Amino acid sequence: YASGDDGVNGVTKSFHETVIIPLPKNKIAFVLEKRDEKNELKEFFRTLIDPNSIYVIKDKVSDASVEILKPVNNGDPHKKVDIVILAEGYTKSEKEKFENDLNRFVGYFFEQEPYKSQKNDFNIYGVFKPSEESGTDLPGADIFVNTELNTTFWSLGSERYLMTEDNLSMRNLAAFVPYDAIYIQVNHPRYGGGGIYNQYCTYTTDNQFAKYLFTHEFGHSFTGLADEYYTSDVAYNDFFKPTVEPVEP
């Protein structure tokens, strides 16, 4: 956002975000760093975390409308890469479609290397929570629907960029299973998706490039694949200075 048109023009905005860390056994210093214009990490936030503090919330997740599927179950989550695929834009009557789509995309995932030869190192979970309405928002067509994760096309001004700013709903739904990576499976025929490194990625289910889209967006969110779209527009401007070598592969 900061390098997009609004951010560059001084329009400020806040984003709800989450950091996932192992539960500490003792007090720790929690530090956040960000890269400066020279691509060097600089500390910008620090706090102490005491796992025994009375202010550590220990709520248990509970929602009778949520159903969990396990299309790939290879054992102890502590020893596997755990991927959760969240349902978005599926109504209660479309649960079977979610399951069919889930199994189809899991199949696509393991057609590709290095995942194909490492399948035993993964667990994949599907988490279904019905939306009130089917699909996702299309602001350019004046279409807005009521869905669980509030995804939308035209994110950050890019027509094909399909994302959500509702981090809280996404994390609350993902919390029903162990996870290292989050996919949002959006029930829609239009081509679109997105991926943010160490955050989440999205993809639509029913377009002709769905197989490519599924693995491509995972590359952005899980393996740090860089944006190098010199043939098409992106949602930001001059993210890297010409004199700086990106760290992304």
Question: Which stretches of residues belong to each language-model region?
Answer:
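Solvent-exposed loop/turn segments at secondary-structure junctions
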Residues: 89-92, 130-134, 188-192, 208-210, ...
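Short pre-active-site segment immediately N-terminal to the catalytic Zn-binding motif
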Residues: 97-98, 193-217
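Fold-level signature of zinc-dependent metallopeptidase catalytic domains
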Residues: 60-111, 126-134
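Active-site-proximal segments of metallohydrolase catalytic domains
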Residues: 121-197
